[in-house]
Curated annotation (Swiss-Prot):
Residues 1-6 form a transit peptide. It comes from the Eukaryota. It comes from Pisum sativum (Garden pea). Keywords: Chloroplast, Glycolysis, Lyase, Plastid, Schiff base, Transit peptide. The active site is at residues 183, 225. NCBIfam families: FrucBisAld_I. Pathway: Carbohydrate degradation; glycolysis; D-glyceraldehyde 3-phosphate and glycerone phosphate from D-glucose: step 4/4. One of its GO terms (molecular function) is fructose-bisphosphate aldolase activity. This is Fructose-bisphosphate aldolase 1, chloroplastic. It holds the Pfam family Glycolytic. Changing residue 35 to W: In strain: cv. Little Marvel. InterPro entries: Aldolase_I_AS, Aldolase_TIM, FBA_I. It catalyses: beta-D-fructose 1,6-bisphosphate = D-glyceraldehyde 3-phosphate + dihydroxyacetone phosphate. Belongs to the class I fructose-bisphosphate aldolase family.
Amino acid sequence: GLTIRAGSYADELVKTAKTIASPGRGILAMDESNATCGKRLASIGLENTEVNRQAWRTLLVTVPTLGEYISGAILFEETLYQSTTDGRKIVDVLIEQNIIPGIKVDKGLVPLAGSNDESWCQGLDGLASRSAAYYQQGARFAKWRTVVSIPNGPSALAVKEAAWGLARYAAISQDNGLVPIVEPEILLDGEHGIDRTFEVAQKVWAEVFYYLAENNVQFEGILLKPSMVTPGAESKDKASPTKVAEYTLNLLHRRIPPAVPGIMFLSGGQSEVEATLNLNAMNKSPNPWHVSFSYARALQNTALKTWGGLPENVKAAQEALLFRAKSNSLAQLGKYYGDGESEEAKKELFVKGYSY
């Protein structure tokens, strides 16, 4: 008969996933590629040098008590092997903070031949050996971001390619001890309304779970990183947090098995406050999975602007990051009331055609 080999890491994967999906905690996404990190640094007038990237990443991981609100941090490969400015391994600093190190493993988006100007995500070649090396280095979870564009269709081909790539990556990750974060980002770009987003998201998640099952991925040992269901960024319609929560939870209930331990939303260019309000609205009533956050810009933005590259601003910048982490922690518990928010935190962070 057909035997499915239980992976040697099965129990560990479940434990890792549950730890990341623990009450009041979420993920700090700090896996921007060096090029994107350079854009962040340029926005505060800094050059994109390894020293500056190291200074910024050191600021992020050394925030005192960060581990109370953050359970995992996604790193870019450079960061997984990097040390802080005072010479401690970044991985060790995270572990001391009670934060599980994760690693971005995809190799970016490239044009998908035969599609309607769409992309696919590369990085499966050599993934098994890279994953094993990342595990040795201390990583315990992985991330693979593929994208679906609504203005471009999306074509059946692009959706299938996205879903299949995610499923292969997930199987390879689990085989090497890493909990895969499954991320088919449905881009905010476009003028479409919320109903169109909902329709596309249903299609995408149906295919993703079909292929995850076909690849014998253990659902208890994965995490999801979906987009919230919102109108397109250029749409005339704006949706309240209540409406975003209603549509998004409806999608999850229809498509995501309760075996999945955690759903860690991406912010996808929402403002810091918007991302927190939407998450809070989704946690107003109990859910079958841990519904939390995996934010990059929506955790880092105010901290970056506060820092401005100046050593004397490090403490204030770290406090800004901690404030955001704490706000999202409250939102994970459904207890965020929007107190003490700055104008900077309310700024729209959407960038057209954004790439990590």
